[in-house]
């Protein structure tokens, strides 16, 4: 009897292990939220002023493109908007027990029809420079901005919500010294209160359903 229980337990554990190793089937239009492994002042500054799903401190986001059997991520990153192989995107994430801290959000059924148009808009941004100062209408783009713009409805109404940006530390309520240095370096006033987006806010959007975690 004990041997049967041990054998059954072993089979169960093996099944769980194999299930965990099975690749997730990404679809074009899936949105990948990433906690970046690079601990630069820029990444820390983003994490200090935004709130993410389950406090995961997302500092980056991109959109999946499945093309000719390969999986890419359309992303606005430094120095420009680009098409990145999925493997490279995952390797750039912080890891937990060897697994990347990346979460997959999938637009809910009512928004699925918006994906083909969104992908074409995202492709039109390829090669555009990264926006280090998070300003609208300057022909430069940051990661969540291209997704916000790509998923605008034809009538201009947004699927993802833009909110007044704040560069104040979540703990102190004061403007983060990291951001002060950042905007001084770019000789630009801090765009406090200007409408914008962030990976953290987008990860909590009601327009998507979290369908997978890589960690």
What are the roles of these predicted feature ranges?
Residues 6, 10-19:
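Hydrophobic h-region of N-terminal signal peptides that target proteins for export
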Residues 1-5:
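Positively charged n-region of N-terminal signal peptides that target proteins for export
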Residues 16, 20-215:
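Cysteine-nucleophile amide-bond enzymes
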């Amino acid at each position: 009897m004990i041997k049967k229980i041990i054998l059954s337990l072993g089979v169960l554990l093996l099944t769980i292990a194999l299930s965990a190793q099975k690749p997730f089937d990404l679809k074009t239009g899936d949105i990948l939220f990433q906690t970046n492994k690079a601990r630069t002042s820029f990444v820390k500054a983003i994490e200090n002023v935004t709130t993410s799903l389950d406090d995961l401190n997302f500092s980056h986001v991109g959109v999946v493109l499945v093309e000719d059997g390969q999986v890419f991520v359309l992303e606005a990153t430094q120095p420009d908007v680009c098409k990145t192989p999925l493997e490279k995107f995952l390797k750039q994430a912080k890891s937990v027990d060897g697994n990347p801290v990346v979460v997959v959000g999938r637009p809910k059924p009512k928004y699925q029809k918006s994906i083909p148009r969104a992908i074409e808009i995202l492709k039109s941004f390829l090669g555009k420079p990264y926006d280090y100062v998070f300003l609208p209408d300057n022909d430069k783009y940051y990661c969540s901005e291209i997704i916000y713009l790509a998923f605008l409805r034809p009538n201009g109404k947004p699927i993802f919500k833009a909110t007044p940006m704040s560069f104040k530390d979540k703990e102190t309520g004061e403007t983060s010294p990291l951001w002060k240095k950042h905007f001084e370096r770019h000789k630009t006033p801090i765009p406090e209160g200007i409408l914008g987006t962030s990976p953290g806010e987008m990860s909590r959007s009601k327009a998507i359903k979290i369908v997978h975690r890589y960690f």
